[in-house]
């Protein structure tokens, strides 16, 4: 399977899993009326409406702000799609697929509902992490894979900093 096809498949599966999870929790399970649900001593399922991005940064309270944030998300997604199209590395294709699928999942929420639905809340004692969704987890995993590739991929002499998987010579 080519990196392009692999990345597109990962993006589609990520988007589908994210949207299915959100729709099931909201409309089938009814999380809004049943929260919080303790999955583990450190993990709850809750329902949070996030008008911004991670940590509610760039909170979009007006229609203009929401559409500006949506436009920024779509521009970044287009950049990632172009990067995926040029990728020759399956690792990078998977990473970009995770980021693209997650970004599209959250962009859909923002366009359709005016906010992103978040559900998962990690906490230990008084420490509390932000509430996130599968799309956010996919984006973080994709960025982690890109970081892994940039730190640990074999580098060839004269590659201009490119990993072998991205068109660099193995010599």
From Swiss-Prot:
EC number: 3.4.23.36
InterPro entries the UniProt entry points to: Peptidase_A8 (IPR001872)
Keyword Cell membrane: yes
Subcellular location as annotated: Cell inner membrane
Pathway: Protein modification; lipoprotein biosynthesis (signal peptide cleavage)
GO molecular function: aspartic-type endopeptidase activity
Top-rank EC class of the record's enzyme: hydrolase
Reactions the enzyme catalyzes: Release of signal peptides from bacterial membrane prolipoproteins. Hydrolyzes -Xaa-Yaa-Zaa-|-(S,diacylglyceryl)Cys-, in which Xaa is hydrophobic (preferably Leu), and Yaa (Ala or Ser) and Zaa (Gly or Ala) have small, neutral side chains
Active site: 118, 136
Gene Ontology cellular component annotations, sorted alphabetically: plasma membrane
Pfam hit, one: Peptidase_A8
Keywords, in A-Z order: Aspartyl protease, Cell inner membrane, Cell membrane, Hydrolase, Membrane, Protease, Transmembrane, Transmembrane helix
Membrane topology: Multi-pass membrane protein
Membrane-traversing stretches: 67-87, 88-108, 127-147
Family to which the UniProt record says this protein belongs: Belongs to the peptidase A8 family.
Function, as annotated: This protein specifically catalyzes the removal of signal peptides from prolipoproteins.
Name used for this protein in its record: Lipoprotein signal peptidase
Organism classification: Bacteria, Pseudomonadati, Pseudomonadota, Alphaproteobacteria, Hyphomicrobiales
């Amino acid at each position: 399977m080519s990196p392009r096809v692999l990345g597109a498949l990962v993006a589609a599966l990520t988007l589908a899993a994210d949207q299915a999870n959100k729709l099931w929790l909201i409309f089938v399970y009814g999380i809004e009326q049943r929260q919080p649900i303790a999955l583990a001593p450190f993990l709850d399922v809750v329902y949070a409406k996030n008008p911004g991005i991670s940590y509610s940064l760039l909170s979009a309270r007006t229609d203009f702000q929401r559409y500006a944030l949506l436009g920024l998300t779509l521009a970044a997604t287009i950049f990632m799609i172009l990067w995926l199209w040029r990728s020759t590395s399956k690792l990078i294709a998977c990473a970009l697929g995770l980021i693209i699928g997650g970004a599209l999942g959250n962009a859909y929420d923002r366009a359709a509902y005016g906010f992103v639905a978040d559900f998962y809340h990690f906490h230990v004692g008084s420490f509390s992490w932000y509430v996130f969704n599968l799309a956010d987890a996919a984006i973080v995993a994709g960025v982690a894979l890109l970081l892994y590739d940039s730190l640990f991929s074999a580098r060839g002499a004269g590659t201009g900093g490119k990993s072998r998987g991205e068109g660099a010579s193995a010599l």
